[in-house]
Amino acid sequence: MSLTYMNMFMAFTISLLGLLMYRSHMMSSLLCLEGMMLSLFVMMTMAILNTHLTLASMIPIILLVFAACEAALGLSLLVMVSTTYGMDYVQNLNLLQC
């Protein structure tokens, strides 16, 4: 395993640990999710470039599309929770009702 792959795996692991440890605030959870998606994007791009697999070259772009949708939904939930309750705790997501 090369050094760059190990660095990206460590970035993913640290983001996952941050997501598991700091679950109280929604903004920190969203930042950890974005770090995970960024490290996955870089790992997939490096793997495709190293293997010269041209048929799978669209997969990182599709991952970025899903990451953008996830970020938009997360930020809209953050705005909704913070305007309704005045704080961005994850536990307030259980109180949201239609």
From Swiss-Prot:
Keywords: Electron transport, Membrane, Mitochondrion, Mitochondrion inner membrane, NAD, Respiratory chain, Translocase, Transmembrane, Transmembrane helix, Transport, Ubiquinone. GO terms for cellular component: mitochondrial inner membrane; respiratory chain complex I. One of its GO terms (biological process) is ATP synthesis coupled electron transport. It is a multi-pass membrane protein. It is found in: Mitochondrion inner membrane. The keyword Transmembrane applies. InterPro entries: NADH_UbQ_OxRdtase_chain4L/K, NUOK/Mnh_C1-like. The chain crosses the membrane at residues 1-21, 29-49, 61-81. One of its GO terms (molecular function) is NADH dehydrogenase (ubiquinone) activity. It is an enzyme of class 7 (translocase). The keyword Transport applies. It catalyses: a ubiquinone + NADH + 5 H(+)(in) = a ubiquinol + NAD(+) + 4 H(+)(out). Its main location: mitochondrion. Its EC number is 7.1.1.2. Core subunit of respiratory chain NADH dehydrogenase (Complex I) which is composed of 45 different subunits. Belongs to the complex I subunit 4L family. Core subunit of the mitochondrial membrane respiratory chain NADH dehydrogenase (Complex I) which catalyzes electron transfer from NADH through the respiratory chain, using ubiquinone as an electron acceptor. Part of the enzyme membrane arm which is embedded in the lipid bilayer and involved in proton translocation. PANTHER family: NADH-UBIQUINONE OXIDOREDUCTASE CHAIN 4L, NADH-UBIQUINONE OXIDOREDUCTASE SUBUNIT ND4L. This is NADH-ubiquinone oxidoreductase chain 4L. It comes from Vampyressa melissa (Melissa's yellow-eared bat). The gene is MT-ND4L.
